């Protein structure tokens, strides 16, 4: 399983701490983008965030928790991410938004909140590269893993052979909960990493998924 580290939970010295995370044996930097509308919290503005992220050597995985999707896609596509993920619940034109991202040469993810069933996104699975299962309510870090997320991952895993997407899980991931999502391809970790010794925490995650 690949590891994406979200730096949303870093409170101080973000650039310095991100440079430490950048040296870890991980696969992605997960970038949470919040507009204060789709979710109540709001992240820093694009110019500030891009100045922090420009030096990272890891691939970027952008998670848009926003309503004005195209506006944010235009901004964050300049960071050359591997994925830009939008929310099923936020988009008013899902296929249009998917194609808008694809036309920029970027892989597309579609995310579902804890109360949204997998059935809702089945019509779009053939068009996307990633499904992001939110295992907490989106908008803030440090929440506990929602157990029903395990069933969603299992359902998406059974469907996966018919499509070309990877499964990503975000929220409440630690060395115990990672055992519940072994069918996932990418796990997003935040406060579990940033609240401790980075390298030992990554190692414990890799042990946990075995």
Over which residues does each language-model region extend?
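Glycine-enriched alpha-helix->loop->beta-strand junction motifs that scaffold or abut catalytic
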Residues: 25-27, 55-57, 77-84, 100-109, ...
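Catalytic cores of alpha/beta
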Residues: 14-21, 68-78, 116-127, 171-187
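Glycine/Thr-rich beta-alpha phosphate-binding loop at enzyme active sites
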Residues: 36-47, 114, 122-154, 158-161, ...
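C-terminal alpha-helical cap/extension of soluble enzyme domains
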Residues: 168-210
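N-terminal active-site wall of soluble small-molecule enzyme domains
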Residues: 30-100
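Hydrophobic faces of well-ordered beta-strands that scaffold small-molecule active sites
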Residues: 3-6, 29-31, 60-64, 82-86, ...
């Amino acid at each position: 399983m690949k590891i994406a580290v979200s730096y949303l939970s870093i409170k101080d010295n973000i650039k310095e701490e991100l440079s430490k995370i950048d040296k870890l044996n991980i696969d992605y930097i997960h970038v949470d983008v919040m507009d204060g509308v789709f979710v109540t919290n709001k992240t820093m503005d694009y110019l500030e965030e891009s100045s922090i992220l420009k030096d990272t050597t890891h691939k970027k995985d952008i998670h848009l928790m926003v309503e004005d999707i195209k506006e944010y896609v235009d901004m964050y596509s300049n960071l050359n991410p591997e994925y830009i993920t939008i929310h099923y619940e936020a988009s008013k034109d899902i296929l249009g938004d998917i194609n808008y991202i694809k036309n920029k040469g970027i892989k597309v993810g579609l995310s579902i909140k804890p109360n949204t069933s997998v059935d809702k996104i089945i019509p779009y699975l053939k068009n996307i590269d990633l499904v992001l299962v939110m295992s907490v309510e989106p908008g803030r870090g440090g929440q506990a893993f929602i157990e029903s997320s395990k069933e969603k991952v299992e359902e998406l895993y059974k469907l996966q052979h018919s499509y070309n997407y990877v499964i990503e899980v975000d929220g409440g991931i630690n060395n115990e909960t990672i055992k519940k999502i072994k069918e996932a391809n990418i796990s997003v970790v935040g406060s579990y990493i940033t609240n401790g010794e980075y390298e030992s925490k990554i190692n414990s995650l890799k042990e946990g998924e075995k």
